[in-house]
């Protein structure tokens, strides 16, 4: 769908601050800064006794025999990032769901899939030296 406009996220860093968490999403073409709440960093670091949203997503994906194909951070508006998670339904169809990029980063803790940023988001937000 966005094949020619996707740039792979090669790595990311977590930079916690007193009032927010900064994720630095690194591509070959620049770094995209993604600011999130402190709660996102906490969800990445802690083990929870009960399932949180990301555990439930993983369970639903497995329970319905879905496979996460990729995620694309495809839009930014007023400093808010938007993403789509692409799911393969047993080879029958690929569906996309709207998802917050911060949720994707937590989901990547337990599930491996490619993460991309659209060229238009990269052009609008990329910074060097952060």
Predicted regions span which residues?
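Divalent-cation
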Residues: 1-130
């Amino acid at each position: 769908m966005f094949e020619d406009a996707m740039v792979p996220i090669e790595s990311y860093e977590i930079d916690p601050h007193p009032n927010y968490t900064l994720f630095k999403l690194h591509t070959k073409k620049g770094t995209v800064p993604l600011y999130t709440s402190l709660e996102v960093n906490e969800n990445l670091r802690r083990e929870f006794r009960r399932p949180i949203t990301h555990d439930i997503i993983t369970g639903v994906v497995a329970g319905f025999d879905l496979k996460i194909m990729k995620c694309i951070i495809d839009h930014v508006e007023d400093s808010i990032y938007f993403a789509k998670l692409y799911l393969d339904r047993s080879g029958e169809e690929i569906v996309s769901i709207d998802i917050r990029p911060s949720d994707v980063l937590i989901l990547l803790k337990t599930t491996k899939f490619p993460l991309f940023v659209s060229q238009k988001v990269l052009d609008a937000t990329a910074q060097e030296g952060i």
